[in-house]
Amino acid sequence: MYSPTRSYSLDINSTNEPHKLHIHEWGKQKNEKVILCLHGLTRCSLDFGPFGTFFSKDYRVVCPDLVGRGSSSWLVNKSLYQIPFYLRDICFLIDRLKSEDITLVGTSLGGILAMFLCSKKTIFSDSFFFSRNDIVDLEKIKNKNNFSKLILNDIGATVNFKELLRLNYATSFDKEFYSSEKEAEKSVKKNFREFGPHSDFEWKFLTQSYIRYDSETRRFVPHFDPGILNPYGLPAIFNGLSSIGIQALPA
């Protein structure tokens, strides 16, 4: 029902580790009006299937799988699963879209990436996420981009400490495996309940985009590389915040 119009991969060799970035698209490829959708931490581009289908008449909807998710490559060096690496990939993709009219839609982690992309240059130097080399490279790339709109979901200008703890707990279940799709759906309903009320069909859809079948174990497992969770341990984030003089997170 929500199958993409096109699916393809980009070979990216300009980063610390060559890899493939997989993209799903809805709508006409020649449409210069683009909506670029960025998914959450443990989700993938197929989450935007209903969204892409709805807007495909008027827009070219482009949805990448962040590296380590969906059909994109898994990195050998797990420490590279970081915001600067994701931003480089997205900028690489944007450069190939050749569009001057891009609307950014970001959910959760995707929203954080979208805010960095739309922000003024100084945000890179003000953030502990970026090294000096990251700042130089990203500011060069970012200067080429012109976004017309920014739409955020499940993220905002302030961070709630309780929500960070909940996220840390929720991602701990993501290393599980499931003997059937039904068992996986039950787990997804429980651990993604903050998504709000959904029909049985919608929960099934969200589950199918979340799991893959592992032929070796003959079980269903989350679609992503478990290594994506390691860089986001809360202690590391708190240490980073304290290193730049932030003593508390606003609620």
Which residues does each PLM region occupy?
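Helix-loop "lid/cap" segments that line or gate small-molecule binding pockets
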Residues: N168-D174, K186-P197, S209-R212
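Aromatic pocket-lining residues of Rossmann-like dinucleotide-binding sites
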Residues: F55, L117-K121
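Conserved serine/cysteine hydrolase catalytic core
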Residues: D214-A251
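N-terminal cap/lid segment of alpha/beta-hydrolase-fold proteins
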Residues: M1-K20
